[in-house]
Amino acid sequence: MKKLILSIALCCAATNFFAQNADPAQLVNDGKAALEAKNYQEAYTKFSTYLTQTNNQDSVIAYNCGVCADKIKKPAEALKYFDIAVQKKYNLANAYIGKAGALKDLKKNDEYVATLKEGLEANPGNKTLTNCMPLIT
């Protein structure tokens, strides 16, 4: 009995040891194809897996992952990825708009207002950010 349990444990360990992560380039390509097909759940899954593998280093994919998370009604995840895009200064106005939208969906009104103000400071005159401000003042 002990040998059977040991054999099963050894097989599981070997399987995990030799398991390979999905190819990052393939994840990005699959995610982009899913995004173009408006399959936001699939795109979100591919992009978030890629970002986990690469330690959230890709600002473009982080932004796209935020868009997908927003489309599938996952505001906490959208906030995380839009925040990465803001920190890396990618597509800054839209990243701030996405971040603010996620905060609004999470009913974090003070942070929502602060994000819009921060977005306007970083993007003076942005029409979308400017149009959101009268709604909160």
Stretch-by-stretch model annotation:
Residues 50-51, 84-85, 118-119:
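Canonical positions in the second alpha-helix
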Residues 36-37, 70-72, 105-106, 135-137:
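Register position in tetratricopeptide repeats
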Residues 63-64, 98, 128, 132:
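Canonical tetratricopeptide repeat
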Residues 25, 59-60, 94, 128:
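Start-of-helix register in tetratricopeptide repeats
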Residues 55-56, 90, 124:
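Short coil turns that delineate tetratricopeptide repeat
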